[in-house]
Design a protein with these regions (language model features):
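Short beta-strand-to-loop capping motifs
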Residues: 50, 70, 128-132, 207
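Acidic/histidine-rich catalytic neighborhood of metal-dependent amide-processing enzymes
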Residues: 1-56, 109, 201, 205
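Short Gly/Ser/Thr- and Asp/Glu-enriched loop/turn motifs at secondary-structure junctions
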Residues: 120-123, 157-159
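A structural signal for small-residue-enriched, beta-sheet-centric alpha/beta enzyme cores
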Residues: 76-79, 112-121
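FAD-binding subdomain of flavoenzyme oxidoreductases
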Residues: 37, 46-61, 67-72, 79-83
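Extended amphipathic alpha-helical segments enriched in small hydrophobics
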Residues: 122-131, 135-136
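Acidic-enriched catalytic cores of C-N bond-cleaving enzymes acting on peptides and small amides
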Residues: 38-39, 56-63, 82-112, 132-206
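Alpha-helical metal-binding/catalytic segments enriched in His/Glu/Asp
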Residues: 1-8, 66-72, 77, 82-100, ...
Length: 207
C-alpha cells in the first residue's frame, strides 16, 4: 500500500477496492522484518489558490532584479524528523521577505522550493524586483534580517546559507499588491509540530 508513498501514495491509489468489504484496516507496515507498528500516520493534501493577475515585464531603467537563495539546511522526513525543528527553507524565505517588505516594496517574479510532499524543504529560491532607488535600503534590510534568521536557527541549522545576488536582467513580475499576497501566504503557512501526544512521551501527534 505504500508503494511510491514518497510522491503521493500511488500504490494505495491504484488499489482495486471492489472486492474489499471490511471497514477497518490494521496497519502492520514496517521497514524491519518481524517488527510491527502500533500506530499509523496519515496526511491531508491542501491546494491553495489565490488570484494574482498577470505578470508584466520589469524595466531595467526602473527596477533592479535580485535572486535570493536559502540553502545549507538539513531537511529531513516531515513525519519522522519533524520534532527536530529543522528549518523549512520556504518558511525561512517567507520570513525574510515579510521582514524586508515592511521597509521596501517588493515585486515577486518567481518563488520555488521543496521537491517532495513529505520532505522538509531544504532549499528555496526567489526572484524579485526592487525599485532601483530603494536598492541600498533593500540590501541593508536583507543583511539585517539574514543575521536575525541565522541567529534564530544556528542551534539546529549551523550551515544555513541565505544569499543575495544582483541579476542584470529584466523579469516578469507580479503587481505590488499581488506580491504582498504571495509573501503573506508564505509567512502565514503553518509549519512544524502542532501537538505532541499526551499518551506516548516524545511522539508527535499532529504536525
Amino acid at each position: 500500500l505504500t508503494s511510491d508513498e514518497e510522491i503521493g501514495m500511488l500504490g494505495a491509489q491504484a488499489l482495486d477496492t471492489s472486492d474489499i468489504t471490511a471497514r477497518r484496516l490494521i496497519n502492520i507496515d514496517s521497514e524491519t522484518e518481524g517488527v510491527l507498528f502500533v500506530s499509523c500516520a496519515g496526511g491531508v493534501r491542501a491546494q491553495c489558490e489565490i488570484e494574482l493577475g498577470s505578470r508584466v515585464a520589469s524595466s531595467k531603467n526602473v527596477h533592479t532584479v535580485y535572486e535570493i537563495t536559502v540553502g545549507g539546511l538539513q531537511g529531513g522526513h516531515s513525519g519522522v524528523e519533524i520534532h527536530k525543528q529543522h528549518a523549512n527553507a520556504i518558511k525561512v524565505l517567507g520570513s525574510l521577505l515579510t521582514g524586508i517588505q515592511r521597509e521596501c516594496d517588493i515585486c515577486v517574479s518567481d518563488i520555488t522550493g521543496g521537491g517532495k510532499e513529505n520532505a522538509i524543504p531544504k532549499e528555496a529560491t526567489a526572484f524579485i524586483a526592487i525599485n532601483s532607488d530603494e536598492s541600498p535600503a533593500f540590501v541593508k534590510k536583507f543583511r539585517e534580517y539574514t543575521a536575525i534568521l541565522q541567529q534564530e536557527y544556528k542551534a539546529v541549522e549551523p550551515d544555513i546559507a541565505i544569499c543575495l545576488e544582483k541579476k542584470d536582467i529584466a523579469a516578469d513580475i507580479y503587481s505590488l499588491e499581488a506580491s504582498k499576497n504571495i509573501i503573506y501566504v508564505l509567512g502565514q503557512a503553518i509549519d512544524g509540530v502542532c501537538r505532541m501526544s499526551t499518551q506516548i512521551q516524545g511522539m508527535v501527534e499532529t504536525s
